[in-house]
Amino acid sequence: MNELVYGLSALGISLNSVQLGQFETYYQELVDYNSRINLTAITEYKDVQIKHFLDSVSLVLAGIKGDEKLLDVGSGAGFPGLPLKILFPAIQLGLLEATQKKARFLSEITVKLGLSGVEIISQRAEDTAQNPLYRQKYSLVTSRAVADMATLAELTLPFCAIGGRVIAPKKGDIEEEMDRAATAVKKMGGRVFKVIKVELPGLEDGRKLVLLEKISNTPALYPRRAGIPAKTPLI
């Protein structure tokens, strides 16, 4: 885990032996499971350390606290939620993943990593956000999903409690995308708080963290039915 350790040193973070072992186990299980179902195209040891593990942990640049109640929307293979949980074991973590095979991997890897305080939710975000057990219950919501910011706002902000935040990793020039998302962010009860540049070893490719803050309740009609936020973004 030399690449990860080096990258984390730029953040002033060091891993103990337990955490290093967890990341090693995560890598081995990810590659093994990936041979059976498609979790990721990134499987080389060095690349996983940088493009999955370090990229996930880079969210600490947004000021993550160790006692967050965090929901990872469209978690896939567990990024960024599980690396953040390894780093901050006291986080209460929800991993929202609609694809059953991926959700099964998340359940298995959580056990193998010895993590507690993790809930796997295998449902669509649009449906889950209308459930009072999850709606406006989280201090922090993340999503690495490849989606337009207007769509992401509708799929993430309804989960945020007032005062909570969404952290959405993005790459490249996002000014036009953020302009398009302004209506959706406002309708969901949010505001664009800030955009943080990510400049870490191996991640010098224009990565950014978009931070949204929840400032008012999301109206009951949002999010719309499954599939609609992606097909017809609020722009």
Swiss-Prot record:
GO molecular function, one term: rRNA (guanine-N7-)-methyltransferase activity
Residues that, per the record, bind S-adenosyl-L-methionine: G74, F79, E97, A98, T99, A125, E126, R144
Keywords: Cytoplasm, Methyltransferase, rRNA processing, S-adenosyl-L-methionine, Transferase
GO cellular component labels: cytosol
Signal peptide start-end: none
Coiled coil: none
Enzyme Commission number: 2.1.1.-
Regions that span the bilayer: none
SUPFAM superfamilies for this protein: S-adenosyl-L-methionine-dependent methyltransferases (SSF53335)
Location in or out of the cell: Cytoplasm
Main location: cytoplasm
InterPro entries with a match to the protein in the record: rRNA_ssu_MeTfrase_G, SAM-dependent_MTases_sf
Function: Specifically methylates the N7 position of a guanine in 16S rRNA.
Family of this protein: Belongs to the methyltransferase superfamily. RNA methyltransferase RsmG family.
Name listed for the protein in its UniProt record: Ribosomal RNA small subunit methyltransferase G
Organism: Dehalococcoides mccartyi (strain ATCC BAA-2100 / JCM 16839 / KCTC 5957 / BAV1)
Lineage, broadest ranks: Bacteria, Bacillati, Chloroflexota, Dehalococcoidia, Dehalococcoidales
